[in-house]
């Protein structure tokens, strides 16, 4: 198996890992009920999206 020719320095390793972070999801306030919801998704509290009530079918 191949092995690295040179040891990776702490700085190079840390610079590479700066992009391995978690992103905060985009939360907005629902205009209908005021609850916090994910952007571009139906509100879990009241079931509205884009000013319209979305009826979700349940099995």
Curated annotation (Swiss-Prot):
A Pfam family recorded for this sequence: Ribosomal_L32p
Give the GO molecular function terms.
Answer: structural constituent of ribosome
List cystine links. Answer: none
User: Where are the annotated coiled coils located?
Assistant: none
Q: Which UniProt keywords apply?
A: Ribonucleoprotein, Ribosomal protein
GO-annotated cellular components? large ribosomal subunit
Q: Which domain of life is it from?
A: Bacteria
One GO biological process term is:
translation
Q: Which InterPro entries match?
A: Ribosomal_bL32, Ribosomal_bL32_bact, Ribosomal_zn-bd
Description of how the protein assembles with itself and partners:
Part of the 50S ribosomal subunit.
The UniProt entry's sequence similarity note says: Belongs to the bacterial ribosomal protein bL32 family.
Q: Which NCBIfam families match?
A: rpmF_bact
PANTHER family the UniProt entry points to = 50S RIBOSOMAL PROTEIN L32 (PTHR35534), LARGE RIBOSOMAL SUBUNIT PROTEIN BL32 (PTHR35534:SF2)
Name listed for the protein in its UniProt record: Large ribosomal subunit protein bL32
Q: Which organism is it from?
A: Bacillus subtilis (strain 168)
């Amino acid at each position: 198996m191949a092995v690295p020719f040179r040891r990776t320095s702490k700085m190079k390793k840390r610079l590479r890992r700066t992009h391995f972070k978690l992103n905060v999801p985009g939360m907005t306030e629902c205009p209908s009920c005021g609850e916090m919801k994910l952007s571009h998704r139906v509100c879990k509290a009241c079931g509205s999206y884009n000013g319209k009530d979305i009826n979700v079918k349940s099995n």
